[in-house]
C-alpha cells in the first residue's frame, strides 16, 4: 500500500475522534498491510470530550468567515465538528481534562494491535499529529521502526523526536499538502 494512501487513512481514522480540540488518527502498517488503527478519545464507556465540553460551556459556534493567515481568532479549531470549536480561553481546562480522560491515537493503535495479537515489530506508524513525549516513549518501546507524521502539535514539549531517533526510529514530517509526494520524504 502506498504511504500516501496510509496517511490519508490516518486522516480518515482521525475523524472518529470526539475530541473538541484535536482529532488525531494513527495507522500502523507492516509489510504493506494495515495491522492497527487508533484515534484519540476516552476509554470505551467513558464520557466523550465533545459531550463534556458542551456541558462545561467550552464550545463556540464556528465562525462563518475565513480566517486570514496571521489573524488571531477568538477560538481554536483543530479538526473539530462542523458546527462548534473550542473557545481559546478554555484550552488549558480542556488540556487538563484531556490528560486525565483521553488516550492518544498512537497508544490506542499500539494497544489495539497488542490486544489482537498483532506484532508491530519493524512496522511503520503514520499519525496526523506529532506524538507527545509519553507516546514517543511508547512508540520507542513498541518495536516500530519508522514514524511518519503531518502536523506538529504547537504545545508539545521539545525532545519527543529525540526519544524516537535515540531508539533507532526514523522520523519523517510530511505536510498535508505533500501527501501525494510522500515518497520524497520517506522513500515509499
UniProtKB/Swiss-Prot annotation:
EC number: 3.5.4.12
Signal peptide (UniProt feature, chain positions): none
Entry keyword Hydrolase: yes
Example GO BP: cytidine deamination
PROSITE patterns assigned to the protein according to its UniProt record, in alphabetical order: CYT_DCMP_DEAMINASES_1, CYT_DCMP_DEAMINASES_2
Catalytic residues (positions): 106
Name of the encoding gene: CD
Keywords: Allosteric enzyme, Hydrolase, Metal-binding, Nucleotide biosynthesis, Zinc
GO molecular function annotations of the record: dCMP deaminase activity; zinc ion binding
Annotated CMP/dCMP-type deaminase domain residues: 1-171
Family assignment from sequence similarity: Belongs to the cytidine and deoxycytidylate deaminase family.
Activation and inhibition: Allosteric enzyme whose activity is greatly influenced by the end products of its metabolic pathway, dCTP and dTTP.
Catalysed reactions, semicolon-separated: dCMP + H2O + H(+) = dUMP + NH4(+)
Descriptive protein name: Deoxycytidylate deaminase
Function: Supplies the nucleotide substrate for thymidylate synthetase.
Cofactor (UniProt): Zn(2+)
Positions that bind Zn(2+) 2: 102, 104, 132, 135
Enzyme class label: hydrolase
Subunit structure: Homohexamer.
Cofactor note text: Binds 2 Zn(2+) ions per subunit.
Keyword Zinc belongs to the record: yes
Origin: domain of life: Viruses
One Pfam family, short name: dCMP_cyt_deam_1
Lineage: Viruses, Duplodnaviria, Heunggongvirae, Uroviricota, Caudoviricetes
Binding residue positions for Zn(2+) 1: 19, 49, 94
